[in-house]
């Protein structure tokens, strides 16, 4: 009887361990896929543009335009100052490290963190390689143009939006427990 109980516990631990490994593989694949898609898209855009600010008209609301961004997502915090550039790069590095630790948790948020890390790694590599990040997606409605952005920015933003939605709609009980 005791032997069967011990065997059942070890089988449960084995299944749990296999599930953790499977989830880690999924999260790593998500990060790597986002990073790879981002880097390939940037490589392609850089290769077809001869000059910065050249335009490729795709539709009535979408263009490709190469912009070199020294700030963070959507051109925010672009100071043209080496100190701030280095500070932002250092902060991004530490945010990626923190998110990698959060990804190890086995909860729904870890997949959203994986999306953020995939995008952040793509932009971080560009900051190191090019000293700026190539942005190229120019979404606009008539003459109103949104910030020019890239694939990495999309996944960072999507991950953050998913985290916010999860907190607002799916973690109501946790917020009530803290009160």
Where are these regions (language model features)?
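Alpha-helical transmembrane bundles and membrane-interface segments of multipass inner-membrane proteins
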Residues: 2-179
């Amino acid at each position: 009887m005791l032997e069967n109980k011990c065997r059942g516990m070890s089988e449960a631990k084995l299944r749990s361990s296999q599930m953790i490994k499977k989830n880690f593989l999924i999260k790593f694949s998500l990060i790597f896929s986002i990073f790879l898609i981002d880097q390939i898209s940037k490589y392609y855009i850089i290769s077809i543009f001869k000059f910065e600010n050249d335009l490729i008209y795709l539709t009535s609301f979408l263009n490709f335009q190469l912009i070199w961004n020294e700030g963070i997502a959507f051109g925010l915090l672009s100071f043209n100052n080496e100190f701030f550039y280095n500070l932002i790069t250092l902060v991004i590095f530490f945010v990626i490290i923190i998110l990698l630790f959060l990804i190890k948790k086995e909860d729904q948020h870890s997949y959203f963190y994986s999306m953020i890390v995939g995008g952040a790694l793509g932009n971080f590599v560009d900051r190191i390689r090019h000293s700026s990040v190539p942005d190229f997606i120019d979404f606009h409605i008539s003459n109103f143009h949104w910030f020019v952005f890239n694939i990495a920015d999309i996944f960072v933003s999507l991950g953050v939006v998913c985290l916010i939605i999860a907190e607002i709609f799916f973690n109501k009980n946790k917020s009530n427990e803290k009160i």
